[in-house]
Amino acid sequence: MDENDLKQQIDTLIRSYPDFPSKGVLFRRVNLIICLSLIKDKLSPRLGLKDVLPLFSKPTLVHSLCCYVANRYKNKIDLVAGLEARGFLFGPIIALELGIPFVPVRKQGKLPGPIISASYQKEYGKDVFEVQQGALSAGQRVLIVDDLLATGGSLHAAEQLVKQTGATVYANFVVIELGDLNGRKVLASEVDAFLTY
């Protein structure tokens, strides 16, 4: 299946839910493209929220998407880092396709042992991402994977974590980018968005 066919098929899974989770927001469900909690004033009603979970009702599309991403980065990266929680859905599949390690980027307090952390500002407060010390090594080229790019805060924190280890962010891959929010402007590395709204 070519890229345009894949994009078209995934795009058809998007569902819109007016006034969800609050009045004035249009929630679009993609059966797995993200249930992101953003405050209403940061989103235009046209953008709404995106949910990638419906995509998982079509396992062949999930596999095709992950193979597409793996082919784009073959021989260019050494490791895939997935952001909690939905980066865990795509990242391991991409890493398996490439035969390279996957590292989970977890929220604070969920990893045992020595950790490295980076904080970031969310719409409703501060949050922290962590990786275990030794999970990434200096010089490794890393693909950071998440389902959605909105304001860029979580991906920026993940970039900071990778940088602290001495590894390099090769690119950030997201299934969906909410382009009007300009989240890519806060990121130091390339953003590869499969779909942009």
Residues covered by each model-derived region:
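PRPP-associated nucleotide enzymes
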Residues: 1-197
